[in-house]
């Protein structure tokens, strides 16, 4: 299980947000499995 950037506003209910990442200057949630 690797943490991934999600190109949407929210992480899934099975994930938790641990920070932000930038993709082309836009911030997205950085999500990890719980």
Curated annotation (Swiss-Prot):
Disulfide bonds join 3-32, 5-21, 11-31. Its main location: secreted. GO terms for cellular component: extracellular region. One of its GO terms (biological process) is defense response to bacterium. InterPro entries: Alpha-defensin_C, Beta/alpha-defensin_C. Keywords: Antibiotic, Antimicrobial, Defensin, Disulfide bond, Secreted. SMART domains: DEFSN. Coiled coil: none annotated. It holds the Pfam family Defensin_1. Signal peptide: none annotated. It is found in: Secreted. It comes from the Eukaryota. Microbicidal activity and inhibits corticotropin (ACTH) stimulated corticosterone production. Belongs to the alpha-defensin family. This is Corticostatin-2.
């Amino acid at each position: 299980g690797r943490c991934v950037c999600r190109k949407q506003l929210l992480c899934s209910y099975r994930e938790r947000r641990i920070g932000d990442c930038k993709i082309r200057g836009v911030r997205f949630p950085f999500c990890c499995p719980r």
